[in-house]
């Protein structure tokens, strides 16, 4: 396709006509400068601006490359909203493609995004689609929007005394309300299996190489590790009173997510490596490429800090999500990963293991 914004004919044929989830809340259109989301239908409190108990959550998630791009875009948007304690409502897309990209690739991408958005009951609100000489593969930037209530989860701690039991946020009138934050002696729960996003991508991109060691049927199964990457089914569980904080596990894997949560809350960690849920397919793919599966992108996985992890794990399993208590938060700053009688310190996030394969 030509460099610059895609032709109007391509935009209409391969983008707008592939989007079917329109409503009075908003819909994308050619020539419009912005998408408009009418909040009154699903957030009546917006009639007078932000209310004391509700607001809007927004997040931006980048997706690089064509492999499972639609799933990574939509599931990433949905899970980032759920982790923030928000109900996902809409996404906006910025799509940049290399010059050699074909219209059929764009059409297939939008068609799958539309299908997933309908499945998740969210809108594609607006977007920008262009071909750029500065990119060598698909670059998809997804802005997610959700409605949020006073029950939102927060991980910010009092960094002065490391005891933060409560924090506060200001409403539209400048008043404050209390929110629970992460402190020591909480259970850490992983919902979903770690490394599955990265393992599925590697299985799809390097199937021929993997066939040197594994059966084609085994590799095919690995490609589907990320098929159930949405956590919408457990949204209500994430709002249970025992759940203090939720963190979306993505680039850098579970080790990065653990560090980010602990650093934000100024707490220590004690993690049992053997308790972290992981699929054998993920382990095998990582062994072939000599990768650390705990540092591999893990879209479709959430990290929870809970007051009663065992109860939350039981609920997650009853909802069909693999889950486990993997450790606890501790006082101080020691962040330890334990394996049997050995222990080592967790290090700050490094480059995702996915990028090591070429």
What are these regions (language model features)?
Residues 38-45, 58, 62, 87-159, ...:
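Glycine-rich anion-binding loops of enzyme active sites
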């Amino acid at each position: 396709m030509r460099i610059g914004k895609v032709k109007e004919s391509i935009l209409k044929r391969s983008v707008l006509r592939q989007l079917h989830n329109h409503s009075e809340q908003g819909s994308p259109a050619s020539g419009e400068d912005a998408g408009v989301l009418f909040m009154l239908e699903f957030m009546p409190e917006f009639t007078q601006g932000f209310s004391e108990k509700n607001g809007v959550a927004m997040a931006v998630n980048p997706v690089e490359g064509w492999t499972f791009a639609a799933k990574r875009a939509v599931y990433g948007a949905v899970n980032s909203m759920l982790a923030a304690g928000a109900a996902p409502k809409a996404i906006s897309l910025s799509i940049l493609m290399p010059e050699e990209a074909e219209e059929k690739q764009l059409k297939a991408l939008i068609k799958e995004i539309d299908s997933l958005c309908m499945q998740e009951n969210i809108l594609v609100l607006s977007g920008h689609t262009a071909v750029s000489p500065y990119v060598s593969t698909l670059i998809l930037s997804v802005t997610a929007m959700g409605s949020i209530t006073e029950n939102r989860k927060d991980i910010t701690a009092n960094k002065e005394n490391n005891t933060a039991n409560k924090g506060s946020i200001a409403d539209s009138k400048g008043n404050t309300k209390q929110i629970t934050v992460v402190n020591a002696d909480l259970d850490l729960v992983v919902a979903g299996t770690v490394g599955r996003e990265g393992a599925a991508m590697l299985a799809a991109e390097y199937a021929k190489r993997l066939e040197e060691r594994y059966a084609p049927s085994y590799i095919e199964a690995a490609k589907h590790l990320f098929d159930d990457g949405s956590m919408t089914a457990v949204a209500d569980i994430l709002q249970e009173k025992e759940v203090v904080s939720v963190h979306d596990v993505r680039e850098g894997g579970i080790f990065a997510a653990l560090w980010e949560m602990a650093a934000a809350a100024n707490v220590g960690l004690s993690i049992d490596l053997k308790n972290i849920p992981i699929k054998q397919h993920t382990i095998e793919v990582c062994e072939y490429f000599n990768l650390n599966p705990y540092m591999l992108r893990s879209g479709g996985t959430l990290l929870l800090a809970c007051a009663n992890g065992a109860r939350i794990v039981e609920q997650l399993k009853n909802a069909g999500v693999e889950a486990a208590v993997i450790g606890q938060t501790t006082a101080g700053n020691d962040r330890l990963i334990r394996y049997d009688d050995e222990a080592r310190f967790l290090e700050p996030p490094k480059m995702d293991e996915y990028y090591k394969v070429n």
